[in-house]
Each structure stands twice: as C-alpha cells, then as structure tokens.
Amino acid sequence: MQFIDLHKQYDVIEAKVNERIQEILAHKHFIGGAEVAELEERLAEYVGVKHVIACASGTDALTIPLMAYGVKKNDAVFVPSFTFFASGESVSLAGGTPVFVDSCRDTFNVDPKALEETIEK
C-alpha cells in the first residue's frame, strides 16, 4: 500500500537534488562537509535549539545522547519491549545495560505499572 507518492515528489525537486549531488561529487567531501554543517545549522534554527548532530543511522542517534548523558557500565537503561533492536543495542554500545519493560497494549509505549515493577526488582 503506497501512502506517499515519492516519485511525484522527486519529479518536483529532481533538478535541484541532482545539482546538489553533482556539487558534492565534484568536491569529494562526503562526510562532515559543508552541506552537513548547513543541514545542522538549518535544523537547529528550525527546531529552536543551539546544536544539532546529523547522524548516519538511528542507532547513532540513540547512542550519542546516552554517551553525552554519561551512561556507563552497569547503568540500567529502561527500554520498551515493543521496539526495534537498536533501542537496546544503543544502550549496550554506550556501556549501559538495557532493561526491557513491557509495553501498553493500546499505545505500545512503556507501561508505567510495568516500569514501576521492573524498577522494584
């Protein structure tokens, strides 16, 4: 089932996308280049924050804040059980221990009662 017509959307922006890709290929600065800095600045302005870090993956996007927060060995980090594996993996990569907590059937978010019970264990 198609929800968004990405082909139609691309048709509208194709010339600009191709132009920018050619510029990047020409200067060969693929990682952390001027375009990444521009994206981070524009996103920071858009969401009203001082800093934005562009990430290569969702796993990086989950791991970096855990590292910045100072998660270390033996720190328990509570993670919803109904999730993608990167949610737990990122905790391990940051040095912590993922502790999975049952989710609410209606919302799929962490069940507050289950969280309380898990903390008490």
Region annotations inferred by a language model:
Residues M1-H29, A34:
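N-terminal "arm"/small-domain region of PLP-dependent enzymes with the aminotransferase-like
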Residues K16, R20, E38, R42, ...:
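Alpha-helical elements of Rossmann-like donor-binding domains used by nucleotide-donor carbohydrate transfer enzymes
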Residues E23-I24, Y46, T118:
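Short alpha-helical functional segments enriched in proximate histidine and acidic residues
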Residues K28-A76, S90, F100-D102:
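Phosphate-binding glycine-rich loop
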Residues M67-K121:
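PLP-dependent aminotransferase-like
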